Every structure is written in C-alpha cells, then in structure tokens.
Amino acid sequence: MGNQKAIPVTMMACVLHGKEDVRLERIPVPDLQPGDILVRVEAALTCGTDLKVFLRGYHERMIQPPSVFGHEFAGEVVASDNGQFSAGTRIVAANSAPCWDCYFCELNKPNLCNDLLFANGAYAEYVRVPARIVEENCLTIPADLPAAKAALVEPLACAVKGVEDVAIQEGEKVLVIGAGPLGLMLARLSVLAGAEVTTVDDQPDRLAVAAELGVTNTVAERLSAELLERLRDEYTPHKLGFDCVIEAVGKAETWNQAVELVRPGGRVNLFGGCPRGTELRVDTTRLHYDEISIYASFHHTPETVRKALEFIATSQVPAFTLVREGRSLQDLPEVLQEMRAGKAPPKTAILPKLPAGACLSAEELEAFVG
C-alpha cells in the first residue's frame, strides 16, 4: 500500500439489514483493492434515495442487505493504493464512475454507462472508494471548505446536469415543481442562470428555504386545476405558460401537470424519478402541435461533479442553506424516521465524531472539525 495513517481494525457503521432495519454495529474496516483509497468520513449527508432504501430495504442497482449504505460524503484519505491521493488529503467522491469503454461512454453519455460502478458505505467511520471512482470522480477539496458543505457535491452534480440539459437562459420564466433538496438545488441553479424562478410545494417551510436561495415566487399549495390556471395567469407572459418546467417530485400526476404548465415551444424536464412501472398518459395533440420538448435527466457526469464542487467552493450555492443540522452516526435511524415524517431539514450532516444525541446548527457546522 502506498501510504497510510494509523487505522483501527474495526469501525462503527450503520448497517442496513432490510426494510426499516438499520443497526449501528462494529464491523471490520474495509480492505483495499489495487487503486483504492480509504477515507475517514468527516460528514455524510442524508438523501431521499437513502430514505427510499431504508423504507424498501434495498436498492436494485446500488445496495443489497446486509450492507453499509449512504453515498454523499467528504473526508480525509487515511490509506491510499493510488498515486493521485496521499494520506492526509481531504476529498469528496461521487458515488459512481463510468467505464469509458461502452457504447454510451463513446457517445459522451457517461451517466448512461452500461457498466456504471456504484459505491455506498458512507454512514460509517471509514469508507472505501473503489479505484475507478478514485480515477474519475474523486476531487481534492479546499482546506477551508467544511466537509458538510463539500458532501453536497454528488446531489448538486445531478441538479447541474438537469439544468444544463434544458439549457435555461437569462430572463426565462422557470417553474420548479417540488421543493425537496433536489428541487431546491434545481431552483438555485436556475436562479444562477438568470431565470425568474417560481417554485410550488405544499410545505411552507421548504418554500422559505427556496426564498433564501433567490426564488422570486413561492406558492404553498398542492397543484390543482385551479392552481395550474392561476400559475399561468399570474407568473407567465401572455398567460401562455412557463418557458421551462422542471418536475422534481417523481409522480405521474405532477409529470402531467408539468406538461400542462409549459408554454408552446417550451421545455419540460421530468427530473423526479417515479417508481418502476409508472405509466404516463399525455395529450399527444398538446405535445405535437405545441412543439413541447420533453427531457429527462438521470444522475451526473464527471464534468458536472467538478462544476458542482466549484459552485459550492465559491458559495454560489450556499450549502448550509440546505444542510441545516449535524447529527451523530448513532442517531441516523432516528433521523431517517424524522425524514419519513416530513420533520427533517432539507439535508442533515451525519458526523461520525459527534457524540450521540448532539445536534449542531448550520452555524456550528461551519466551525465543526470532523
């Protein structure tokens, strides 16, 4: 092995055993394969995907129990079998990497790679980063950037791709449906692109965060036929609809509503993923004669991962507007239940060094050394 710090034999980790069954356990520290690095986790962020994994007990492509889960993290390299990163380097890593050999990689669509390598295991004191991810999607973070900010890179990279896919332009009227963590990131990036952004969500506390991120109009209601008409009438030129609508909920109903709310010649990004087997019924006359362009955005690319880190490091995306508290590794099961009940902030930083029961504010996270 190239270089390393002192590493214990075992570590504390949150292990998924099945549906709604997460246990804090002492397990062996992961062994490294050639080209891997071992990272001491300073911060791992909660994620809607992790909540789904917790509720379902598995993820078809990424995780089968029993297994440590969590995939948004930043930390310090403590052992390296890779010349790019030495022990002591602080890094953020994405949760996947493409092969660059398949048909889609040759088309420069690495997010659609036939052999996309996924990695999990961030809800632990240490996490192994596989060699391919080290080579493609592992970045050094600035010395003054808190880990709880840097860990936002992976989801933000997905949002960067979503906004780039629909090429939002300055002065456009953009509607984001849903103000969950990714909806908020999509809204902020649309603001940075120069758009006038409207966000609709039925939870006022989420919309308060959207306003902090520069969203011009926030509407705290569930979408209905009456609200669709009012949104067009009040927030779009000539009452024709929005230039671009981004759906960030992941339901067939809101996918359809997104199509209804866009203007003729406009673009829709069906960003929110629906459960497998969900079917969509749309008015084909509307699509064809109004020339509606439909997009869907999945995952991230090495390019958008790097752009995401730049947005965070330069504070163009104020990470602690989203990451609003820090909790301990021991408290993760409780945090997941709070997320399930809709009582959690957009993002919670899970901090392995934090004592059980402690809770840090965003201001305290700024100074916390993981």
Where are these regions (language model features)?
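Glycine-rich cofactor phosphate-binding loops and adjacent beta1-alpha1 units
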Residues: 166, 213-292, 356-360, 364-369
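NAD(P)H dinucleotide-binding glycine-rich loop of Rossmann-like/cofactor-binding domains
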Residues: 99-177
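Mid-domain Rossmann-like dinucleotide-binding core that forms the NAD(H)/NADP(H) cofactor-binding site
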Residues: 90, 145-223
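C-terminal hydrophobic helical "lid"/dimerization subdomain
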Residues: 2-13, 233, 256-260, 302-370
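Short glycine-centered segments of the SAM/dcSAM-binding site in methyltransferase folds
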Residues: 90, 173, 266-267, 293
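Residues in the short beta-alpha loop(s) of Rossmann-like NAD(P)-binding domains
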Residues: 203, 274, 300
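N-terminal glycine-rich cofactor-binding segment
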Residues: 14-31, 48-79, 106-120
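Glycine-rich beta-strand-centered segment in the early N-terminal region that forms part
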Residues: 30-44, 58-103, 140-144
